[in-house]
Amino acid sequence: MKIICDFHIHSKYSRAVSQGMEPITLSNWAERKGITVLGTGDFTHPGWLKELKEKLEPAENGLFRPKSQISNLKSQTRFILTAELSCIYTKNGRTRKIHLLVLAPDFQAVEKINAQLSWSFNLVSDGRPILGIDAHNLAKLILETDERCLIIPAHIWTPWFSLFGSASGFDTIEECFEELSPQIYAFETGLSSDPEMNWRLSQLNNKTIISNSDAHSPSKLGREANVFDLDNLTYDEITRVIKENDKDKFKYTVEFYPEEGKYHFDGHRKCEISLSPEETKKHHNICPVCHRPLTIGVLNRVESLADQEINAEGRVPFKSLIPLEEIVSDVFSVGVKSKRVEEEYLRLTEIYPEFEILLDISERELNSLANPQIAKGIMDAREGRVTRVPGYDGVFGIISVTGKKEAKGRTEIKKEKQQIGLF
């Protein structure tokens, strides 16, 4: 049974998150996307936890579904209890800022974790709480509370808040998690890296690489995801596959093109400076406009820690895609949130779920279903025939199947290069 999972999202109780991130809306969007199992996000927040208990009911072991009396239709979506925790602390003489994704087997485990954390930390102010605790100590607390929990370092390359982040991360897993390192089974790529980039680190050779959307609004669900082939859809089976890196059951991940991630290249957003690692080296990591340190992006950081060449043998494969809304927007040359894009997106996903359109439907059927340019864009995205302007310092990159968005992005980059030449 093909199962598509997106474990990392946020609720309406997190900062800068859509009010549409609530159980029934999430369930409806998950079905439109073709997502089978969706993380709840934010289980540490009392308000969100209360809402989850009120609106969800047990389904398969460790999974939940919307209550039938609340949802208009019998939902096929399953929820798994998840949260992202932000650890900010000092270790080995440096400030560390690490985000951890946590999967929990049931509400009892969640309540025990929350009870432990609430003694020392404020869980009310943000769905993704900021905790002044060493990531190692937090992992130990959670695993001692319930060993069935799964702890996954989130978006491990993001400069500011991640395990390997250039600004406040570590160089090795062991430096962060010490003796618990063998119990950290999986690592999340984040939008600015793909599995190939992670394969360049030998310390990740025996670890599972997963990908999730980190969605802050319903339409962003599934922009990255994990595809399993499971005989039994349960919490224990999902976590077993992840822990064991079971390649027979873990079929592939769905990825952003990493250049679209907002920290792929180095740069300085305020000065509109975007640089490749080679260009950054020439400028000695200093912004050529304001002469302040550049934000070192994911590609550069991977290069600095890499100790082996890319080898796909024995790895869980991946497929790079462009979200359907973005393809439609690119083809129609209108904003992704425009009415024209919304209408076409809703029309197409009434016929098939988005993932089926992006991954499975034949070119012939796509041409009968959609505008020929949209069909071509989907096929081009599948085959990697796209143009790319990398993101940098919090600015999303541009991935285009038509070249229209790319041309605009290249013009902006060219202006930045000309500006560099003045200093």
Q: Where do the protein language model's features map onto the residues?
A:
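Histidine-centered divalent metal-coordination motifs
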Residues: 8-12, 155, 216
